[in-house]
Amino acid sequence: MGANVLIMAGGTGGHVFPALACAREFQARGYTVHWLGTPRGIENELVPAAGLELHRINASGLRGKGKLSLLKAPLMLLKSVWQARAIMRRLKPVCVVGFGGYVTGPGGLAAKLAGVPVIVHEQNAVAGTANRLLVPFAARVCEAFPDTFTLSDSRRTTGNPVRSELFLETSRPALAGRKARLLILGGSLGAEPLNKLLPEALAQVAADLRPEVFHQAGKNHDEVTAERYRAAGVDAQVQPFIKDMAQAYGWADLVVCRAGA
């Protein structure tokens, strides 16, 4: 067993999938990878399925919360940092790598207090709150897009880690004699503009020219999106989340998606 590395990422696929790609690279180099997340995010499904050990702390955001929650916030942050610190005492990681999500803030602070090097990776052009707060403490700051962290002397523009299975060549039948295949992606949480506008737009395409549709609508948005397709008279396969994205990419001729990691 190699030295331990602790990945911190949670909440959405935009944080978790690049972190999974990074985790695989650490494993290929002989490290043992552990994961720090929360009890509620998508990491609870994806990380154990990837064969990685998931450790959880109680961490959440403050947006949209009431005054009582804001008053409790300092105490909750201290509790989250203490939980993360206890995990790090046990694992003794050689470094922690934060990809964003609520878990990254207290996890990164705990690592700094423990003297563990912190690496930050930001997947988007505009950095999230947790990653921005960790930049002053980070030994290395990685950005997918140039100039996301213009004030950091330790920044490196690395791009986004991509899982190796997405590079596998796939064969699909020629378009002649079949309908085109359209994949619609709004992220793991969905994108309401795509969920609302695509059924309306596809209804205006002649039925004999209309593509096959596979639509990732996001958690809690799949039923209403499927109903929109039915009301528009458009056949579509709608799912809240696509687990096998490599297969979906291999199936599709065209992808409509929103920006994001």
Question: Predicted regions: what is each one?
Answer:
Residues H15-F26:
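Short amphipathic alpha-helix
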Residues T32, I42, E53, K112-S171:
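Active-site-proximal region of nucleotide-activated glycan assembly enzymes
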